[in-house]
């Protein structure tokens, strides 16, 4: 009986060694799903109640930083700025006259102080009008591509109405979820490979940062990375798999 038991254990050893090897291999290459996202993306919304004069970009078209994305009809705002400037000029001249009269002891210091305050108020009105007018042209905060056009030319919009969505497709990052038990191996700068489904290619990437917390339910943490290879064919929204070695 004892011999039979020893024989059974010896016979099972190759299977145990094989199972351990498979387990070790699985731990060495942990398959994870990854998604490619744009680091910079935003929804452009209206900051004023106005009619759109210019909205020439279409979905998929490129733009450069500082380029006008949307322009509004701001004839009223321009007129208000001109009026504010004229009022400031009048207030400034009045203040100058008051100062001369004070030097001649012809008026009181109170009248001079009032004239100075009126000039300051007029100057503030000019600044307000300039700030309002600056919202008439929405400039691109970065270079990139249009992903959705919501508004239409000559449409009248209100404050907060969405106009278009944009992103920087040249600044991409990889995002995936990793088990928190492997946190020690997820060092910033660690290299890994990502195979993208849409292109059928494999790219070299590296970890750039980790999420700020571990999900207590799934026991996972967000990991972010960047592709170090030339990857002009990648677009936000593509996905793939990575094999991250511990």
Describe the residue ranges of each PLM region.
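A short, hydrophobic beta-strand micro-motif
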Residues: 20, 165-168, 188-198, 225, ...
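Surface-exposed patches in structured soluble domains
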Residues: 35, 49, 53-56, 62-68, ...
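Alpha-helical coiled-coil segments
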Residues: 76-131, 149-152, 174, 218
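Structural microfeature recognizing short secondary-structure transition sites
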Residues: 116, 147-148, 202-246
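Short coil-to-beta-strand transition motifs
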Residues: 26-31, 139-140, 195-204
């Amino acid at each position: 009986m004892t011999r039979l038991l020893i024989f059974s254990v010896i016979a099972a050893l190759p299977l145990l060694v094989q199972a351990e090897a498979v387990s070790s291999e699985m731990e060495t290459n942990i398959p994870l799903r990854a998604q490619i996202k744009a680091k910079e993306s935003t929804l452009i919304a209206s900051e004023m109640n106005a009619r759109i004069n210019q909205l020439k970009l279409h979905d998929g078209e490129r733009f450069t930083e500082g380029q006008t994305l949307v322009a509004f009809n701001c004839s009223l705002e321009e007129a208000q700025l001109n009026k504010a400037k004229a009022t400031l000029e009048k207030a400034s001249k009045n203040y100058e006259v008051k100062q001369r009269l004070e030097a001649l002891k012809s008026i009181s210091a109170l009248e001079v102080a009032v004239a100075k305050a009126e000039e300051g108020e007029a100057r503030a009105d000019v600044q307000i009008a300039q700030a309002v007018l600056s919202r008439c042209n929405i400039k691109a905060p970065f270079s990139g591509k249009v992903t959705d056009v919501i508004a239409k030319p000559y449409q009248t919009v209100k404050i907060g109405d969405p106009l278009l969505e944009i992103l920087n497709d040249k600044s991409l990052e990889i995002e995936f979820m990793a088990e928190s038990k492997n946190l020690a191996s997820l060092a910033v700068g660690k290299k890994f490979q990502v195979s993208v489904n849409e292109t059928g290619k494999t790219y070299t990437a590296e970890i750039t940062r980790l999420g700020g917390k571990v999900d207590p339910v799934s026991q996972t943490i967000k990991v972010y990375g960047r592709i170090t290879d030339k990857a002009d064919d990648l677009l936000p929204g593509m996905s793939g798999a990575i094999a991250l070695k511990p």
